[in-house]
Amino acid sequence: AFFYNRGTCEYLHDAGRSGVPAKGLEMNQEVIIVRGNHTLKGDVRVSGAKNSALKLMAASILGQGETILHNVPLISDIELMSEVLARLGATVVREGHTLRINTADVDSCETPYELVSKMRASISVLGPLIGRFGEARVAMPGGCQIGARKIDMHLVGLEALGVAFDVDHGVLAATTPNGLRGTHVYLEFPSVGATENMLMAAVTAEGHTAIENAACEPEIEDLANMLNAMGARVS
C-alpha cells in the first residue's frame, strides 16, 4: 500500500506489529508513506520499450536486407528473439543498444519450439513469415492448442486475409492457397498482438486492408512507422 502526504518519505515495515493497525491498514501490512513538497529535477535515460523492439525485430523478416534498430533494451526476451531470427537464417549483431538485423538469407518459415515456448511474443513472427513466404510453421507458446491462450483473434484476422491454418501437436501451420488479399476486418477486442500480426501480413497482400477496432498502443504506432519506412502505406 502507498500513502501519499506532504513532507518527507519513510517506509514503515509491519505497520500493525504494535497490535493496533494504522487507520485504513490491515495487521502486518507493509506501507510506504511519501511526503512531498520538494522540487523534482534531474535527468534519466529511458530505455527503449520491449514491446516495440520485439515486434520491430519480427517485422525485419519482411525486408530483404539490413534493418537497424536503436535504443533496444538489454533484456532476455530480446536475446531470445535474436536467436529465433538467427534460426530462421538472419544475421543479428548487437552493438550496445543497437541491433543490426540482416534478413537477406532468411530461408526458413519454421520457428524452433525450444525457443518459441519460452517467449509469448514469439507468435509475432507468424504474420511476417506469412507475408514473406506465404506460409509458416510456428510453435504456439507453451505448445498450447487453439483457444487455450488468446491467439484466436490473430487467426481470425489472418484467415480474413486468406490464410488457412492447421494445428498439429502444438505447431501452427499456415498456408495461403490463393495468396493474401486485402479485406475489411472488425476485431471484437482491440488486441495488440492480433493487430500487429495482421499489419505485418497485410502489407504484402494484394489490395487494401482495413482493420476496425484495431489496437492503438504506442508499439502499434512504432510498427506502422517502421512498415512505412520499409515501403508500406499504413495510416
Label each residue range with its predicted role.
Residues 7-13, 22-235:
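Structural preference for solvent-exposed beta-strand-turn elements
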Residues 2-6:
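Extreme N-terminal basic, low-complexity initiation segments
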